[in-house]
Design a protein with these regions (language model features):
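Bacterial N-terminal signal peptides
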Residues: 7-16
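Short glycine-enriched nucleophile-adjacent loop
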Residues: 94-102
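Bacterial N-terminal signal peptides that target proteins for export
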Residues: 1-7
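Lipolytic serine-hydrolase domain surface
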Residues: 27, 41-42, 124-201
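Gly/Ala-rich beta-loop-alpha elbow adjacent to hydrolase catalytic centers
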Residues: 86-90, 94
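Active-site catalytic motif of lipid deacylating hydrolases and related acyltransferases
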Residues: 23-80, 164
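Sec/Tat signal peptide C-region and signal peptidase I cleavage site
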Residues: 16-23
Length: 201
């Protein structure tokens, strides 16, 4: 076996390993109405980035472009676990993204919404969904769509006088909860593992 052949095999193996490592946890955070609010998502994105999560904040109006980007990067092996986070209208459109991804059988490992309103049900490709809202305010509880086998939590913050629709996404306490959820998810799960298990039942 020649040294040149061995070197070629080693190079291919190295490229394969680099491609595997390139699959990263991706978090996309969607601002509320027209992108004028939801400044707290910038801070949450920084906190997620500090945990090693590739995070970016976008305006909710461009959610269809976000779907295209996710499908492209996932096909290229760049996305492992996928996290969608949205505030207000951004929460609604985070769910819209999940529905669009369901068509292509792409799982969403974690969906977090802050006080969405008038939203669609959570689709079956979502593994874990957390909704922070205030009963009697603008936000509403999330409901599961047909075929949903993930875990859905609606957390009512109506009794917290320090939280409103306009600052809920900036709460340090809620950020800490989201960060803990992300950390636990990355330690215990592979991308979409729970979703695949649910489909086998």
């Amino acid at each position: 076996m020649s040294a040149r052949w061995i070197g070629a095999v080693a190079s291919v193996a190295l490229l394969w390993c680099n491609g595997a490592v390139a699959a990263e946890t991706r978090a996309i955070l969607l601002r509320g109405w027209l992108g004028l609010f939801s400044g707290g998502l910038d801070r949450l994105a920084e906190e997620l980035s500090a945990q090693g999560v590739h995070s970016e904040v976008r305006k909710h109006l461009y959610w269809t472009t976000t779907v295209t980007d996710i499908l492209r990067d996932r096909a290229a092996g760049k996305i492992g676990m996928l996290i969608l986070i949205g505030h207000s209208q951004g929460g609604n459109d985070a769910i819209e993204i999940a529905h669009a991804l369901e068509i292509s059988h792409v799982p969403v490992d974690l969906l977090v919404t802050f006080d969405p309103y008038g939203q669609k049900p959570v689709p079956a490709n979502v593994v874990r969904a957390i909704n922070y809202y205030q009963n009697g305010g603008w936000g509403l509880p999330l409901i599961p769509a047909a075929g949903f086998h993930g875990k859905l939590s609606n957390i009512d913050l109506a009794c917290d006088p320090d939280i409103s629709h306009f600052n809920i996404e900036a709460s340090g306490r809620l950020h800490a909860e989201v960060l803990r959820e992300v950390g636990a998810m990355r330690q215990t799960n592979v991308p979409g593992a729970m979703q695949a298990k649910s489909r086998r039942k």
